[in-house]
UniProtKB/Swiss-Prot annotation:
Family (UniProt): Belongs to the helicase family. DinG subfamily. Type 2 sub-subfamily.
CDD domains assigned to the protein according to its UniProt record, in alphabetical order: DEDDh
PROSITE patterns reported for this sequence: HELICASE_ATP_BIND_2 (PS51193), HELICASE_CTER (PS51194)
Organism (species): Staphylococcus aureus (strain MSSA476)
EC number: 3.1.-.-
Classification via Gene3D superfamilies: P-loop containing nucleotide triphosphate hydrolases, Ribonuclease H-like superfamily/Ribonuclease H
Residue ranges occupied by any Exonuclease domain in the UniProt entry: 8-161
GN (gene name): dinG
Protein known as: 3'-5' exonuclease DinG
Hydrolase listed as a keyword: yes
Domain Helicase C-terminal: 703-893
């Protein structure tokens, strides 16, 4: 890092409009030689009003600035401190432009010689971080940030993270550092000087034994699993007793019974369904059963879970805790499909790609660092999004494996016999095929949260043709000889002529004409679909915020598909007899497109269930065509039921109408299942009241405003009496946002944080909700399950409507052909299951007390009410108006104390 001084600057302002807003706080942390050497901080007075949002964000109020200097009073002092420093900030353009403008207003011309953006640094240094927001970076790297959005603390935190990043860079192998230096020349800011100094000052030494080299890539050496040596001669009961004792848990006979039941089914190669009530301690039970099975038989067990969160909990928390408690070394590994793991040949190809793109350049640098760290090569560790993900996916699709390639999936195959417990998820379990031979090495499988399997199976059997995807894939080939893969082919043809390469001539002009025609045919195809949408009945899917067309003629679509497939075939003929790697990449891309169109064509010709979706009715670019290729029952039977000798399905909500029959009907093979129920919810249900308002009118679309107002009234009553947090569940984004708008306008909620479900932000929102004492979380179907509601006071879940899927929902349409009565056999069981999962958000421990409010009077007035009443039979139920609701809250509050 040398002896340069870095001025790490953070500003708080009245807003983000450069020509209007003012600085109200400045914090500077000075760094030299990886040490903080000085700090500067000042509030800055302004004549502008500070907007309420900025006051809430920064905790800076106008009275705090009354004694502060104006910027022109400290401008010279600040300038003198930073004029010779490298200017550093997180999202540097904002801070740099504001401070340059402020200096200019004081007749000071500030032009830093070098500028560094820590957002750029942190993306490169920490390639697996889920977020690059300062507060989340600080949390991820163990740095305390007590007051985010305060300039002094933000500047200090940014500086500490920058030091961590620089120290990480300095420890990298020299070859990696050199490649980072060359790539950094294409960045927006002056990081290349930093890398140059690091390379120049590098203490030359042999490559550390923990690394190996593939071509130009330095990567972390993979360490094989040792054969497990779990010496234990006792019973499962004594193993369970030791585990709960060492872990400080309560000995629960029902939890032991669950573990013993699972072990017995594994030992006898049985198929079983187990409903273990929410909060019964399923994870510990099945982990101990799987471990005991391995100890007694030497066989390993696959455990499939619903979410990445639960996967991480098992591998990073539960299994390490068991190892410590039992003094074992359990070999457990996350297992996915082959395509989820990196190959070094693919990284090499990406590094050699001359695509001139900022995000691609960042990706190359991230890959160089990530591959020195990752023990697994799991691509999802990179959390790729947007353009980076699309680029990476395309590179995977067109990658022609290099000779002597190193593929991380082979490490898992090599170590499979020494893995005692394999952890996967439902999507991978269902997707696995013959090529994914790792799955064939497991004879025994435990499926947790098994009620979610049908959703993943439906995703697996549904094929999609998206305008945006096809347009992107075609764009990667290009339209002329100056773009993408066509440019590479053009250069190859020139090389053939100049260097007399031993390959057949390539018809560049014919190829260019063909690609232009393919682009035009694709536009014609989606224009045809767009016309069909405009001429058809369109139904809104509010949950997914799409518009769907379910009934349409396919003749014109098939005609356009045939034309584009025919043109792709003729284009592929241009490369007959040419085996050069550049040609192979283009052929692979063209074949990918051809297969995409061909699969859709074959399914439509066969009359498979299909529908058209469009996000914006006026934009052709948002069109997607979906076709269901296979029956969900066929896939679940083939990919799950027939794959394992012993198979145990576990969930808190497998039963419907006191029976497992609804779940059994998801398989098309008559197989005997042993069924068990482990119910620990009886005691916790006694701590829960279910309240059904009598003063809320039955929901009708025309009275939605009145219905929403009633929900808000009950939220007001609840928060006024309890001052506690509340989860409100909806089946419609429209209703959710109507409630949000009303809450934000009411003075009763000025000291409450109102959080709303957002795409790809659920985990973060849940964290925020659990951290605040006064919070209201508004969510849709996602939050009916898989969400641990934490609160010190009374817990409340309000259910706006019973979670039925609408008959215009795509799932309803796609599954309709698989049932005699879709509502009775699929929709109703699904709604009851989701309702039960919603109840489970409330009571997660014996000490929890809470209340469930269901506004939907179908719970007690419909002809299917008894199916829901069965789920509530252990709960205390009360029907009444809002005054009686308030009275009940006070009673619960009194008991809680």
């Amino acid at each position: 890092m040398g002896m340069a001084t870095y001025a790490v600057v953070d500003l708080e302002t009245t807003g983000n409009q450069l020509d209007f807003d003012d600085i109200i706080q400045i914090g500077i942390t000075f760094v030299r030689n990886n040490q903080i050497i000085d700090t500067y901080h000042s509030m800055i007075r302004t004549n502008l009003e500070i907007p309420p949002f900025i006051q809430a964000l920064t905790s800076i109020e106008e009275n705090m600035l009354q004694q502060a200097p104006y910027f022109n009073q400290v401008a010279q002092e600040i300038y003198d401190k930073i004029k010779d420093c490298i200017f550093v900030a997180h999202n540097v353009d904002f801070d740099l432009n504001f401070i340059k403008k402020a200096f200019k207003d004081c007749n000071i011309q500030y032009r830093p010689k070098k500028v560094i953006d820590t957002l750029e640094i942190f993306k490169i240094a920490f390639p697996t971080d889920k977020s690059y927001q300062l507060s989340e970076l600080a949390e991820a790297h163990g740095i305390t940030l007590a007051n985010a959005h305060r300039a002094d603390e933000d500047a200090a935190t940014t500086a500490k993270l920058m030091i961590l990043a620089f120290e990480k860079f300095e420890k990298l192998p020299l070859d990696t550092l050199k490649q980072l230096y060359y790539l950094s020349k294409q960045l927006k800011y002056d990081l290349y000087d930093i890398f140059f100094e690091m390379v120049r000052q590098y203490d030359a030494k042999p490559l550390d034994k923990s690394y190996e080299k593939f071509e130009q890539i330095i990567y972390r050496k993979q360490v094989d699993f040792k054969k497990p040596t779990t010496n234990y001669n006792g019973s499962l009961k004594s193993l369970y007793s030791k585990a709960v004792d060492q872990l400080g848990l309560t000995y629960r006979p029902q939890q032991l019974y669950l573990a013993e039941t699972i072990l017995d089914q594994l030992m006898h190669s049985e198929k079983a369904m187990i409903e273990a009530s929410l909060g019964s301690g399923k994870s510990l039970a099945y982990l101990l059963a799987a471990l005991m099975y391995n100890i007694e038989t030497g066989k390993h067990v696959m455990i499939s879970t619903n979410t990445k969160l639960l996967q991480s909990q098992l591998l990073e928390k539960d299994i390490p805790a068991m190892n410590e408690a039992l003094n074992f070394k359990i070999n457990a590994l996350l297992i996915k499909s082959k395509s989820d793991y990196i190959s070094l040949g693919l990284i090499s190809q990406i590094l050699k790609d001359d695509t001139s793109n900022y995000e691609v350049n960042i990706l190359k640098m991230q890959l160089l660092i990530w591959i020195t760290e990752t023990p697994s090569g799991d691509i999802q560790e990179l959390n790729l999004k947007g353009g980076q993900k699309m680029y990476f996916d395309q590179k995977i699709e067109t990658y022609v494996p290099a000779r002597h390639d190193v593929h991380y999936y082979n490490f898992i195959k090599r170590n499979a016999q020494n893995i005692q417990i394999g952890i996967t998820n439902h999507a991978h379990l269902i997707h696995s095929d013959v090529e994914n031979s790792i799955y064939q090495l497991f004879d025994d499988c435990i499926v947790d949260e098994a009620h979610r399997l049908p959703d993943y199976a439906l995703n697996q059997v549904t094929n999609e043709l998206s305008y945006a995807d096809i347009k992107y894939q075609l764009g990667l080939i290009g339209k002329n000889e100056n773009e993408k893969l066509l440019k590479a082919i053009d250069q190859l043809e020139k090389q053939r002529i100049l260097e007399k390469l031993d390959i057949a001539p390539i018809d560049i002009f014919g190829l260019k004409a063909s690609m232009n025609e393919i682009h035009e045919l694709n536009e014609q195809l989606f224009s045809t679909i767009f016309t069909i949408i405009n001429d058809s009945d369109v139904y809104d899917d509010d949950i997914h915020r799409f518009h769907n067309v379910f009934t349409f003629e396919t003749k014109d679509i098939l005609k356009d598909l045939h034309a584009i497939i025919d043109k792709l075939n003729k284009t592929l003929e241009i490369f007959n007899g040419i085996s050069h790697k550049t040609v192979k990449s283009l052929r692979k891309q063209l074949l990918y497109l051809k297969d995409k169109f061909k699969n859709i064509e074959q399914s439509l010709k066969a009359g498979h269930t299909s529908f058209i979706s469009i996000k914006n009715l006026s934009q052709k670019s948002t069109i997607r065509l979906y076709v269901k290729d296979y029956a969900v029952k066929d896939v679940l039977t083939k990919q799950v039921l027939e794959k394992f000798k012993s198979l145990i399905f576990i969930s808190g909500t497998l039963k419907f109408n006191h029976s497992f029959e609804a779940f059994k009907q998801l398989f098309n093979k008559d197989v005997h299942f042993n069924t068990f129920e482990v119910n620990t919810s009886l005691q916790s249900a006694k701590n829960t009241s279910v309240f059904i308002p009598s003063d809320v009118a039955s929901y009708q679309y025309k009275n939605i405003d009145e219905y929403v107002a009633s929900i808000v009234s009950y939220i007001i009553e609840y928060t006024t009496i309890t001052s506690s947090k509340c989860l409100v569940l909806f089946t419609s984004y429209k209703m959710m946002h109507m409630v949000q708008d009303m809450l934000n306008e009411l003075p009763e909620f000025e000291d409450y944080v109102v959080l709303t479900q957002q795409q790809n932000q659920n985990y973060k929102i849940v964290q925020q909700f659990n951290n605040f004492d006064k919070a209201i979380l508004l969510g849709t179907s996602t939050f009916f399950e898989g969400f641990d509601f934490q609160a010190n006071g009374i817990k409340c879940v309000m259910i706006a409507k019973l979670p039925f899927m609408n008959k215009h929902n795509a799932k309803y349409w796609l599954m309709d052909s698989e049932f005699t009565s879709t509502f009775k056999e699929y929709v109703l069981p699904d709604a009851v299951t989701r309702f039960r999962q919603g109840l489970g958000r409330l009571i997660r421990s014996e000490n929890d007390r809470g209340i469930i409010v269901s506004f939907d009077d179908r719970l007690i007035n419909s002809n299917y009410k008894n199916f829901f009443e069965q789920t509530l039979e252990n709960y205390r139920q009360k029907k009444g108006d809002i005054q009686q609701f308030g009275k009940l809250l006070r009673q619960i509050q009194k008991k809680k104390k």
